[in-house]
């Protein structure tokens, strides 16, 4: 199992602007890296951490209990953040964090089918109890056109047509390694020689489609903004352009008046009447030192929005 190092840890905790008696939500518990740092800063406050993976919940509980008891782990998908908090009697919070990096323990388990590094069944469901759509179903039942669209839209895969065509010709495809083999046959030799794994984009695309990730993120972010107290903040760490697009569009919607959309090139700022403001126009990126020490961080960006 690879060691998981939280990305942009110092910056994300700093921009959450944690008050020791505040209420905070970590929407992506994962390996509890960010949750641990939030919890250390709370005195009478409370942390709610969300995850739908049993292993993450067990490991997270063990890790956080060593720090303090001022936390509660909520099992489920962050698309239900409002309802989950309401069940705890919480209707407004001081800060919410999303680390959208793939970091859950389940990604290192071969039988979950997320990784092109391990051979396992083509599953990729985050929530196996409530989601019936698997990567196996998509790979073996969708049309070539549908597969192309998924690979292009969610993986930005230039060779989507070639991969989709070969998937159709190679059916049935039952395991991750069988799919990797088909992908490799579909790509030019020069691409196969590159450092990046040839299956990375296809696996990303399938995972996003199986778990409806972009629509889920969009819905959850909107709920989070409506949960904030005045001066409360939402901090998001993104890792690829699809996530960036969702965050950027929602943050724009909540911070810019209509006239600002059309007059954005003016040499002076127009004060927005909206209830939210961005802490910085362009997202923060990791330092060169962090990228050198943690390769996962090279594409990470930090976004922060505050309720006025």
UniProtKB/Swiss-Prot annotation:
Keywords: Cytoplasm, Methyltransferase, rRNA processing, S-adenosyl-L-methionine, Transferase. Its main location: cytoplasm. Gene3D superfamilies: Putative methyltransferase TM0872, insert domain (1.10.150.170), Vaccinia Virus protein VP39 (3.40.50.150). It is found in: Cytoplasm. S-adenosyl-L-methionine binds at residues 32-34, 51, 78, 99, 106. GO terms for cellular component: cytoplasm. The keyword Transport does not apply. Belongs to the methyltransferase superfamily. RsmH family. This is Ribosomal RNA small subunit methyltransferase H. It comes from Mesoplasma florum (strain ATCC 33453 / NBRC 100688 / NCTC 11704 / L1) (Acholeplasma florum). The gene is rsmH.
């Amino acid at each position: 199992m690879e060691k998981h190092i939280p990305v942009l840890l110092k910056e994300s905790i700093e921009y959450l602007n944690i008050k020791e008696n505040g209420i905070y939500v970590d929407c992506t518990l994962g390996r509890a890296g960010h949750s641990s740092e939030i919890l250390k800063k709370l005195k009478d406050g409370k942390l709610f951490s969300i995850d739908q993976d049993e292993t993450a919940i067990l490991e997270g509980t063990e890790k956080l209990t060593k720090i303090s008891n001022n936390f509660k782990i909520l099992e489920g998908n962050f698309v239900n953040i409002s309802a989950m908090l309401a069940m705890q009697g919480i209707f407004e919070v001081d800060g919410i964090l999303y680390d959208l990096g793939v970091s859950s323990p389940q990604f290192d388990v071969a039988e979950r089918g997320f990784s092109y590094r391990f051979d396992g069944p083509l599953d990729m469901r985050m929530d196996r109890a409530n989601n019936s759509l698997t990567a196996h179903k998509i790979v073996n039942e969708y049309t070539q056109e549908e597969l192309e669209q998924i690979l292009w839209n969610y993986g930005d895969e230039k060779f989507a047509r070639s991969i989709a065509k070969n998937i159709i010709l190679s059916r049935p495809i039952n395991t991750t390694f069988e799919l990797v083999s088909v992908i490799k046959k579909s790509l030019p030799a020069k691409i196969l020689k590159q450092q990046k794994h040839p299956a990375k984009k296809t696996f990303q695309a399938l995972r996003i489609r199986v778990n409806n990730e972009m629509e889920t993120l969009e819905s959850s972010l909107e709920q989070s903004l409506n949960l904030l107290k005045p001066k409360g903040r939402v901090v998001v760490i993104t890792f690829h352009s699809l996530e960036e697009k969702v965050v950027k569009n929602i943050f724009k919607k909540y911070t810019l008046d209509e006239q600002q959309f059309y007059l954005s090139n003016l040499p002076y700022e127009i004060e927005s009447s909206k209830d939210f403001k961005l802490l910085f126009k362009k997202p923060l990126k990791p330092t060169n030192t962090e990228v050198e020490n943690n390769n996962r961080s090279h594409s990470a960006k930090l976004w922060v929005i505050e309720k006025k």
